[in-house]
Amino acid sequence: MIDVSDPENPVFAGCYSEDGYSHDIECVIYRGPDSRYTGREICWGYNENSLTLVDITDRSNPVQLSRTVYEGVAYTHQGWLSSDQRWALLDDEADETRSADK
């Protein structure tokens, strides 16, 4: 994570690398249905073989909230949150290469 509050002098602010490679990440100020995280900065990481949620409110100490894998995972590529932050719509880039019966 890079702090660009002063664009002419970007500063390293922290890193989260506990779940391997991440293809795409969406970070939001959380306003979804779980009130425990309201107002916190939460990132949804689409991490090759999982969906991982990380609280980065304290950039120097990011905390993994969950890691989810799913049947038939091939390459968790990207995703989007619904406007109410109730649903994450996930795109697996390579699951089409597997037949439904395998």
Question: What does each of the following model-derived ranges do?
Answer:
Residues 1-102:
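Feature marking well-ordered beta-strand scaffolds used for ligand recognition
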